[in-house]
A protein has these predicted regions:
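Conserved small/polar residues in nucleotide/adenosyl-binding loops
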Residues: 3-10, 167-171
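Glycine-rich phosphate/diphosphate-binding loops and the adjacent beta-loop-alpha structural elements
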Residues: 19-23, 67-72
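Residue-level signal for short, function-critical loop segments
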Residues: 22-24, 127, 165
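Cysteine-nucleophile active-site neighborhood
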Residues: 69-149
C-alpha cells in the first residue's frame, strides 16, 4: 500500500488538488478551513456523494465534512459506484479527512434513527449511528502522531468537538 505524506504547507513539490464533498448530505463545512487550504495553495474541487458517480480525477486528498448522511442514507447507499470509488482510492493511499457525517459515511454501515441499516463506503469495519442528541461539546487538544496533510508529527493544535454520533466497531 502506497502512503502519501504531504503537508499542505510544503509548496515546493506542487499545489495539491483536494476533493471536498458538498451536497445535501454533506453540507456542514467550515469556510475558515477551506479558506486556509486555498491560501496554502490548494485547489479545491467539489463533488456530490449523492449525485456524482465517481470522485474527481487527479486529486491529492479527500475531505468528507459533516452534514446529515443519516437523512440521505438510502440515496448514499444506492450510489454504489461512488462508495466503491471512495473506498478504493482511500485503500490505495489517498489521504482523507472525515468528520462527523463524513466519518459515518466511511463505515461499513450507517444506521438511521429509524433503525434502518444501509451499506456505506466500508473503510471502517463497523456501523455508525446518529445518537439523536449531542454527546459532548467543547474544545480539545490534538497531537499529530505522524506527518499528515494538516500537521507535522508531534504538532499540537486545538479542535472543536460536538459529536452526535457513535460507532460500534467489529473485529
Amino acid at each position: 500500500r502506497r502512503q502519501r505524506q504531504m503537508c499542505i504547507r510544503d509548496r515546493k513539490k506542487r499545489n495539491l488538488r483536494i476533493a471536498v464533498a458538498k451536497d445535501e448530505a454533506f453540507c456542514f463545512l467550515y469556510e475558515d478551513n477551506l479558506d486556509y487550504l486555498r491560501q496554502s495553495g490548494c485547489e479545491l474541487t467539489y463533488f456530490s456523494p449523492l449525485k456524482d458517480s465517481i470522485l474527481p480525477e487527479n486529486i491529492d486528498g479527500l475531505l468528507l465534512y459533516g452534514g446529515y448522511p443519516e437523512l440521505h442514507a438510502e440515496e448514499l447507499s444506492e450510489n454504489i459506484s461512488m462508495r466503491e470509488d471512495i473506498a478504493g482510492r482511500i485503500q490505495s493511499g489517498l489521504p482523507c479527512i472525515a468528520e462527523c457525517g463524513g466519518f459515518l459515511y466511511l463505515h461499513e454501515y450507517l444506521e438511521t434513527l429509524d433503525k434502518e441499516k444501509y451499506p456505506m463506503a466500508g473503510i471502517i469495519r463497523g456501523t455508525g449511528y446518529n445518537a439523536g442528541k449531542l454527546q459532548r461539546f467543547g474544545y480539545m487538544s490534538v497531537k499529530a502522531v505522524k506527518n499528515t496533510m494538516l500537521a507535522d508529527k508531534n504538532q499540537s493544535f486545538r479542535a472543536h468537538e460536538f459529536p452526535v454520533s457513535y460507532t460500534h466497531l467489529r473485529a
